[in-house]
């Protein structure tokens, strides 16, 4: 039974990792919660407009795409991107999930970012762009996680 549970947990984690692709950002919130539970990590959720929001694009370019952030995130966070693009196509299922999350977290602007526990409970949050590059952003996340 123990080996069976280990195998199932591994499958869930590997499936979630496959969904994440090279960027490390998941788009399936429920899969992210399962991965967070399995890996005992908090969730870092990013509400964004990847193809129209200037501050979101700047944050991606200057922080999230950088090796320093990606290495920290890989070891300490489960990343979730909740995107509201204007030009990029999304499945009806993804649109419905994102709309539900937008309402649940009462999003009023982009980017909005939260740290959540594995159950989806909000630990802390930020609205807007934070300057300073990946090193400053990682330090900010470390401070938030200490609380």
In which residue ranges do the predicted regions lie?
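Positively charged n-region of N-terminal signal peptides that target proteins for export
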Residues: 1-5
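Bacterial N-terminal signal peptides
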Residues: 7-15
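Sec/Tat signal peptide C-region and signal peptidase I cleavage site
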Residues: 16-22
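Thiol-based oxidoreductase modules, predominantly thioredoxin-like and allied folds used
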Residues: 25-26, 69-95
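Non-catalytic, surface beta->alpha helical segment in thiol-disulfide oxidoreductase systems
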Residues: 62, 104, 108-147
């Amino acid at each position: 039974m123990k080996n069976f549970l280990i195998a199932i947990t591994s499958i869930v984690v590997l499936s979630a990792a496959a969904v994440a692709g090279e960027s490390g950002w998941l788009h399936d919130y429920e899969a992210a919660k399962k991965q967070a539970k399995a890996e005992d990590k908090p969730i870092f959720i990013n509400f964004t407009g990847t193809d129209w929001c200037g501050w979101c694009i700047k944050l991606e370019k200057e922080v999230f795409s950088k090796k320093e952030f990606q290495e920290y995130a890989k070891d300490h966070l489960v990343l979730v991107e909740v995107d509201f693009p204007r030009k990029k196509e999304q499945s009806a299922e993804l649109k419905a999930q994102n709309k539900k999350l937008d309402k649940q977290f009462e999003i009023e602007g982009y980017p909005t970012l939260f740290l959540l526990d594995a159950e989806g409970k909000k630990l802390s949050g930020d609205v807007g762009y934070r300057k300073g590059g990946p090193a400053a952003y990682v330090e900010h996340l470390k401070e938030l996680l200490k609380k």
